[in-house]
Design a protein with these regions (language model features):
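C-terminal, charged and often intrinsically disordered regions of DNA end-processing helicases
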Residues: 1-66, 287-298
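Short beta-strand or tight-loop elements
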Residues: 34, 135-141, 152-156, 262
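Nuclease catalytic cores
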Residues: 38-58, 62-83, 116, 120, ...
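Active-site-adjacent bridging/hinge elements
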Residues: 45-53, 163-171, 240-244
Length: 298
């Protein structure tokens, strides 16, 4: 844990943990990173090297339909909130989805149209429950916070203000698996976003939510001061490893710190064509397989 422990009896006290101690002495340059970068390192050092260090990066495989689906929904919802309140209708959300639709990764036009129709239902149902007159504090907002070791940053899907004045981090999800409150509480990214949003907005922020559009469910958690401190400590722990690997790469060791970490997820890796271990560990998947699985799962 960095700095001094923040008081736990006030709202948002945990954010102070992330920034206290920053001026206590910084013998090294702060390491800039995002939760995505840290989690990529944790998942697979080889993929991390391909994603962030090796230039030019190895060629990727074809685009994934499930990634296009997520991008389409996120972009449509962001565009919906950019409208004036009178224009924010569920039907306009469906129209925006059609306008923002990303076609890449689907088997053919018929499959893309079928998935778009399914996603249109998600968006319509979701926006039926959103007050069009409520203005979020941020949409696709970049937030950042320095700690004793890092500069953490990331882009948040939505930052809401509740009627009691509290601030909530909202993350949209479009995958097949429904999410639980434990998923929201355990998410490193959401915890980091809460700390960073508090610093960026100068307001307490301890609540995080995962909005799962396929099921219309919300997984929520309210972090304690200690919980937010643990998220910062977790980020710093992962970053120490990633930074050491970065330095080794810069010094010429491009292999030792970056072993492949084969798993079933290798089927879905962008860099599968460049990784023999990944190809051996998991079967080939067509770019549209995940959206077929989503339909089969209901």
């Amino acid at each position: 844990m960095t700095g001094r422990r923040a008081p736990a009896d006030g709202p948002g006290g945990g954010q102070q943990v992330a920034v206290q101690g920053v001026l206590d002495g910084m013998p090294r340059r702060l390491y800039p990173c995002t939760p995505t970068r840290l989690l990529t390192w944790l998942d697979c050092p080889r993929r991390y090297r391909f994603s962030y260090l090796e230039r030019p990066a190895p060629p990727k495989g074809p685009p994934w339909a499930h990634s296009s689906l997520g991008t389409s929904v996120h972009t449509a919802l962001a565009a919906w909130f950019a409208l004036g309140p009178r224009r924010r209708t569920p039907q306009r959300g469906v129209e925006l989805l059609r306008e923002k639709w990303v076609r890449e990764g689907y088997r053919d036009d018929a499959q893309a149209a079928e998935v778009r129709g399914r996603a249109a239902g998600w968006v319509r149902d979701y926006l039926e429950d959103v007050d069009p007159h409520t203005e979020p504090l941020g949409i696709e907002r970049t937030v950042s916070v320095p700690t004793a070791q890092l500069v953490l940053s990331g882009r948040v899907d939505r930052i809401d203000e509740r009627r009691d004045g509290s601030v909530v981090i909202v993350d949209y999800k479009t995958g097949r698996r429904p999410l639980s409150d434990d998923d929201a509480r355990g998410s490193l990214a959401l915890g980091v976003y809460a700390v960073a949003a508090a610093r960026t907005l100068r307001r307490p922020c301890a609540a995080v939510e995962l909005h799962h559009l396929p099921t219309g469910t919300v997984a929520a958690a309210a972090h304690s001061a200690d919980g937010l401190a643990r998220k910062v400590a977790e980020a710093e722990s992962i970053a120490r490893e990633a930074r050491a690997a970065d330095e080794a790469y810069a010094a010429g060791d491009t292999e030792t710190p970056f072993p492949a970490r084969p798993s079933s997820m290798c089927s879905w890796c962008d860099f599968r064509p460049a990784c023999p271990q990944g190809r051996a560990a998991a079967p080939h998947r067509d770019p549209w397989d995940a959206v077929l699985a989503e339909r089969a799962g209901g």
